[in-house]
């Protein structure tokens, strides 16, 4: 919300539905599958209310990134969403700028969900940070529709398809394939999950540890039972980042996890080649950083 606020007068309004956020929104009497179906029903009801002829697409991150701290979809959620979109002629657009290109253990995070979107946004892992590059992958039917029409695509940029950036991206993808790094991400992810649970799973101010592959989020709470967040004025996430840096660990902090104002979390996204020793250090140093930050609150 805070990123959008200053540009709001220039932007087209979009309708939002509830995110897949089981830690806070799944009812105690509800199974994960039932929760996912409820969200899909909400999406369908919203499309019907607006009129399917007025809805061009449903856009979501396959795994929520910076805004909410690696929200992992419940089983069947995206399959149900895909079915809703197909019934109403609505495109499914998935944003995998953060979670895609191997970060969660498959090249595309949506592979785990067994869903194919109509459009897929990718970036960070595409070039591994060596060159700035992003891409939009489109299903053939969309490309064919444009080709059979005017054939004119007026959304290019000056450095679109830059040869050096594309060469870097190709080199990164070749290394990922050559060195079997997707399998390594899956293996390391299981190890990191176990280490984080051992280090922070019973921490009185850690609400949830969630993620997949080498993409993890830790949500902080004032009270585990009520899930009450900390006062946003404390900026706990920023304190944790500062403490983590002093301990030699880089994390991605963010506030507003719950509703755009309340809530704190930190993201972990270590390199695909992180060793087991380094994974253990990450879990240990994050625990130390959280404890040090809380001591100053």
Regions found by a protein language model. Give the residues of each.
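Conserved N-terminal phosphate-binding loop of PLP-dependent enzymes in the Aspartate aminotransferase
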Residues: 1-297
């Amino acid at each position: 919300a805070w990123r959008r606020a200053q540009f709001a007068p220039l932007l087209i309004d979009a309708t939002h539905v509830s995110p897949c956020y089981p830690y806070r929104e799944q009812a105690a009497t509800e199974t994960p599958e039932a929760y996912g179906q409820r969200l899909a029903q909400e999406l369908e009801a919203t499309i019907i209310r607006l009129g399917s002829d007025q809805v061009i697409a449903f856009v979501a991150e396959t795994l929520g990134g910076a805004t909410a701290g690696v929200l992992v979809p419940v089983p069947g959620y995206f399959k149900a969403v895909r079915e809703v979109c197909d019934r109403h002629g609505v495109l499914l657009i998935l944003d995998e700028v953060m979670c895609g290109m191997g970060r969660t253990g498959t090249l595309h995070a949506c592979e785990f969900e067994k869903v194919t979107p109509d459009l897929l946004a990718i970036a960070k892992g595409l070039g591994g940070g060596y060159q700035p590059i992003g891409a939009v992958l489109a299903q053939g039917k969309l490309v064919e529709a444009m080709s059979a029409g005017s054939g004119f695509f007026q959304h290019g940029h000056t450095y679109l398809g830059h040869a050096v950036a594309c060469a870097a991206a190709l080199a990164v993808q070749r290394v990922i394939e050559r060195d079997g790094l997707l399998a390594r991400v899956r293996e390391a992810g299981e190890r990191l999950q176990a280490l984080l649970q051992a280090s922070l799973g019973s921490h009185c101010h850690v609400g949830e540890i969630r993620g997949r592959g080498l993409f993890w989020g830790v949500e902080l709470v004032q009270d585990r039972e009520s899930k009450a967040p900390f006062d946003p004025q404390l900026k706990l996430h920023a304190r944790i980042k500062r403490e983590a840096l002093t301990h030699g660990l880089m994390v991605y902090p963010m506030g507003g996890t719950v509703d755009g104002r309340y809530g704190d979390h930190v993201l972990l996204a270590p390199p695909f080649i992180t060793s087991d020793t380094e994974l253990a250090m990450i879990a240990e140093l994050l625990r130390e950083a959280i404890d040090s930050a809380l001591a100053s609150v």
